[in-house]
Amino acid sequence: MTSRTSLTIVLAAGEGTRMRSSLPKVLHQVAGETLLAHVLKAAPEGDGAALAVVIGPDHQAVAEEVGRVRPQATTYVQRERLGTAHAVLAAREAIAAGADDLLVAFGDTPLISAATFARLRQPLAQGVALVALGFRPADPTGYGRLLVQNDRLVGIREQADASADERAIGLCNAGVMAIDGKAALRILERIGSANAKGEYYLTDAVAIARELGLEAAVIETSEDEVRGINTKAQLAEAEAVMQARLRQAALDAGVTMIAPETVFLAADTTFGKDVTIEPFVVIGAGVSIGDGAVIHAFSHLVQAKIGKNASVGPYARLRPGTSLGDGAKIGNFVETKAAQIDPGAKVNHLTYIGDAHIGPNANIGAGTITCNYDGFGKHKTEIGAGAFVGSNSSLVAPLKIGAGAYVGSGSVVTRDVPDDALAVERNQQKVSEGWAKRFREAKTRGKTRPAK
């Protein structure tokens, strides 16, 4: 198998009108990745594995996603949407290059696995010319049935054309197919459009292969793996299946999740050893969590790196570009963005840290705000090692607070603070003795304010 070359053609030209969205269907997301990205990542890769993606004429965003996920892939445009076989032949140039195995998949099936693609190719190495992927849905209504005799696929019958006996067959066509590369164009170019819609259907390839004296077979997989996404409801169903997979994989890897069903992960989330995730945590794309870290309840993380033995939350929001050092702490109702928080630093309560670098073992008091935006651009705040910022302070960037410096509570700091210095910016406190007593007496007599 490893010596056989392959070409995977992913069909992604559909409009997806039932999604009721201006976004192309294959660019909707499951577990922080587009539907298309999931399929592209599952397709064979490495030496001898080519990849082609067929897109619509107005799908530049889809082409860009292909380039982001699999830069070596080639895109082809299906200018008229005339059926699945017509879409495959949009990549005729790639097919003609003569890979040993041709795989045809769909860009809206995010749950398909690399293992399934590998199983689909195995019969080709044994001389079978065409392999269809089948599944057994709980309700087969509407699906084409796979007709099998003596362990060989003899046809695909659409629901509308099936006899009563054929409709009783539980094995259905998933649409995914593997074809011997040497026979692929011979089969595909014989597919006609003599049907009610005047389209070219890939399912006709089975009958044509048999007419040519070639063998066809079936490989079965689960219904979940081949879920196609056509509506927002189906998108939600696929998300649920993917989340269940990701949670189980995390648990198997040793992550402690107190209530797994309340935790949402991304497809690329990575965990170290002895990580604990409390209930109602949402982890978006691009998050890595180091050994011994704890993510407390109701926290939300996206594109963030969490160091060893660090603590996040509860009720924390870590936005893209956050890097939390070993043993650092982000407490409750703290938001960070583009922030490097070094080992041992603490940001414990009610704070916004954006476009900032906080040095090792610095302490940021409750209610501190980095004022990073002046209405036109973002500016950086740098806080040195061991610095202490008192509660309710506003740090107006660009700003540097030196190592070991102190900022008095309630200060609005607009100028740099040297190492080991104290910065205090607030009005002098005024105390009027007896004022409160006079105020109460005045109110009692009906006056509005007491004498000063």
Swiss-Prot record:
Underlying gene: glmU
EC number: 2.7.7.23, 2.3.1.157
PROSITE patterns per record: HEXAPEP_TRANSFERASES
Binding site for UDP-N-acetyl-alpha-D-glucosamine: 11-14, 25, 78, 83-84, 144, 158, 173, 230, 319, 337, 352, 363
Region (N-acetyltransferase) residue spans: 254-452
One GO-annotated biological process of the protein: lipid A biosynthetic process
Quaternary assembly: Homotrimer.
Binding site for Mg(2+): D108, N230
Main location: cytoplasm
UniProt protein name: Bifunctional protein GlmU
GO cellular component terms, semicolon-separated: cytoplasm; membrane
Pathway: Nucleotide-sugar biosynthesis; UDP-N-acetyl-alpha-D-glucosamine biosynthesis; N-acetyl-alpha-D-glucosamine 1-phosphate from alpha-D-glucosamine 6-phosphate (route II): step 2/2; Nucleotide-sugar biosynthesis; UDP-N-acetyl-alpha-D-glucosamine biosynthesis; UDP-N-acetyl-alpha-D-glucosamine from N-acetyl-alpha-D-glucosamine 1-phosphate: step 1/1; Bacterial outer membrane biogenesis; LPS lipid A biosynthesis
Positions contributing to acetyl-CoA binding: A366, N372, Y373, S391, S409, R426
HAMAP family in the record: GlmU
Region (Pyrophosphorylase), start-end ranges: 1-232
Keyword terms of this UniProt record: Acyltransferase, Cell shape, Cell wall biogenesis/degradation, Cytoplasm, Magnesium, Metal-binding, Multifunctional enzyme, Nucleotidyltransferase, Peptidoglycan synthesis, Repeat, Transferase
Positions annotated as active site in the UniProt record: H349 (proton acceptor)
UniProt-listed InterPro entries: Bifunctional_GlmU, GlmU-like, GlmU_C_LbH, Hexapep, Hexapep_transf_CS, MobA-like_NTP_Trfase, Nucleotide-diphossugar_trans, Trimer_LpxA-like_sf
Subcellular location: Cytoplasm
Cofactor annotation comment: Binds 1 Mg(2+) ion per subunit.
Catalytic activity: alpha-D-glucosamine 1-phosphate + acetyl-CoA = N-acetyl-alpha-D-glucosamine 1-phosphate + CoA + H(+); N-acetyl-alpha-D-glucosamine 1-phosphate + UTP + H(+) = UDP-N-acetyl-alpha-D-glucosamine + diphosphate
GO molecular function: glucosamine-1-phosphate N-acetyltransferase activity; magnesium ion binding; UDP-N-acetylglucosamine diphosphorylase activity
